[in-house]
Every structure is written in C-alpha cells, then in structure tokens.
C-alpha cells in the first residue's frame, strides 16, 4: 500500500500546477488523505533515523504540499468567540476527553496543532503551534509561544523553551525538515531553521539563530561547519571577525561537548557558563 501511495504522489507532484480543489482526481485525493491520516497517527513520518542516519521521505513531504492544492478554505468555528478560515482542520477539533486520555498528552489553551501532526505521549503543549507534518516525540515540552514548523522532527524529552522557532519546509520551501534529536534543550527565542539538524543531548542557549548559512564555530578545534550541531554540544551565540578585520559576522559557537551522563546530571545554566 505504501509503495502504491508513493507512486500516486510522485506522479501527481510532476503535474501539481494542474490540480485544484475542483479538478483533483479521486485517487489523488484519497492517497493524500491517507498520508495525512498516517502522519496524524504517527505511523508515517516525513523523516526517520535509519542505521544512524536521517532518511527523508520526500514523497511524504510532497503529499503535505499537494494537500494545500486539493482543499478549499472553509470556516472553522472554535467555541463561542473564535472562528478560523483555513484548508487544514485542527488536530483536536473532534477530540473527546477519552481521546485526550488515550493520547496521553496535555494541551494548554490556546495551543494549536494542525491535523497531520503527531503529538507523543507525555508531551506538554503550552500555548504554542505545531504545524502539519511535524512529529513531536514523547516526553517533550513545547513551551509558550514556541512554533514547530511543517514536517519538523522533534525527538524524545526535548525542551523547546518560550518563543522558540523550529523551521518548516513549506514557506519558504525547503528540501529537508529541521530535526531536533532526543534530549536536547533549545533556549528561549532561539531559531533553528532550513533543515538544520541538532544532534542528541545538545544544549542551545537563549537567542541562538542557526540556518544553513550560519557558521558553526567549534572553540576547541577552530573548525567551522554548517547545518549540523554535533551530539552533546553546548552552543551559544557569538561573532567571527572578517578576513580584513574590519567587521564581524554572527555565528553559533560550540563552547564545549558533554556526554549523556554529564548532560543528565548537570543543570542547563551550569553547562552554559564558561
């Protein structure tokens, strides 16, 4: 079944400009709906780790993007005083108390997750936003006003502090999702975007911005890399001088590395102190 869905989605993607809510064929509508439903249940993911490396299911991401071409905006009542007008229903629109109990997570008003996102057990959603295609694994905290972008992958026991932004793949369109691995801490108002991978047990300080063009400077080695924070890194914001010494440009600085045992025993503030 998955192979058949993939084939339908890939073929439709090549002609995506031709589709609209009025002319989309039934088999395409059904295929996209099945993919979104599986994303919603967590049985299908945009990306997963295989033998230590992240593998992106590009066809699943295409299905998410196609879904926007196949649906019209509709009015979505939400309580007595609020309404929305969108193509994607909210994840919890039809949830009962039993559904929430079975899910095993907390949703603090007015948190919003879109249909097609997955929320794992023991996740706490403070007033925040989780977009379609995103996967938030068990035990994680999405703190107040944090946003988890479309198709982003959040690992187990991750803390996304207040106002954190995890970039999506839809606007602007990106090749790969942003990934935060297990047991990471992302400090308040930090932004991780453009398919950057933060590997497990890392700590990102408050106000650190990392995209694919951001220089990541390792203080211990002097090496500059892009797009990936190594496992167990403690990262703060910094600057690197230009070659002519006339100006400096923003960078992210790896100030130290810690193993999982140290990470578990040491407080966040202590790790961030130099």
Curated annotation (Swiss-Prot):
Top-level EC class: transferase
This protein's record includes keyword Cytoplasm: yes
Alphabetical keyword list: Acyltransferase, Amino-acid biosynthesis, Cytoplasm, Diaminopimelate biosynthesis, Lysine biosynthesis, Repeat, Transferase
Pfam families the UniProt entry points to: Hexapep_2, THDPS_N_2
Keyword Acyltransferase attached: yes
Positions with a binding annotation for substrate: 106, 143
Subcellular location(s) of the protein: Cytoplasm
TM stretches of this protein: none
MF GO annotations: 2,3,4,5-tetrahydropyridine-2,6-dicarboxylate N-succinyltransferase activity; nucleotidyltransferase activity
Pathway stated in the Swiss-Prot or TrEMBL entry: Amino-acid biosynthesis; L-lysine biosynthesis via DAP pathway; LL-2,6-diaminopimelate from (S)-tetrahydrodipicolinate (succinylase route): step 1/3
Its EC number(s): 2.3.1.117
GO biological process: diaminopimelate biosynthetic process; lysine biosynthetic process via diaminopimelate
CDD domains: LbH_THP_succinylT (cd03350)
GO cellular component: cytoplasm
Catalytically driven reaction(s): (S)-2,3,4,5-tetrahydrodipicolinate + succinyl-CoA + H2O = (S)-2-succinylamino-6-oxoheptanedioate + CoA
PANTHER family, per the entry: 2,3,4,5-TETRAHYDROPYRIDINE-2,6-DICARBOXYLATE N-SUCCINYLTRANSFERASE, MOLYBDENUM COFACTOR GUANYLYLTRANSFERASE
Subunit note: Homotrimer.
NCBIfam families, A to Z: dapD, PRK11830.1
Family label: Belongs to the transferase hexapeptide repeat family.
This protein's name: 2,3,4,5-tetrahydropyridine-2,6-dicarboxylate N-succinyltransferase
Name of the gene this protein is made from: dapD
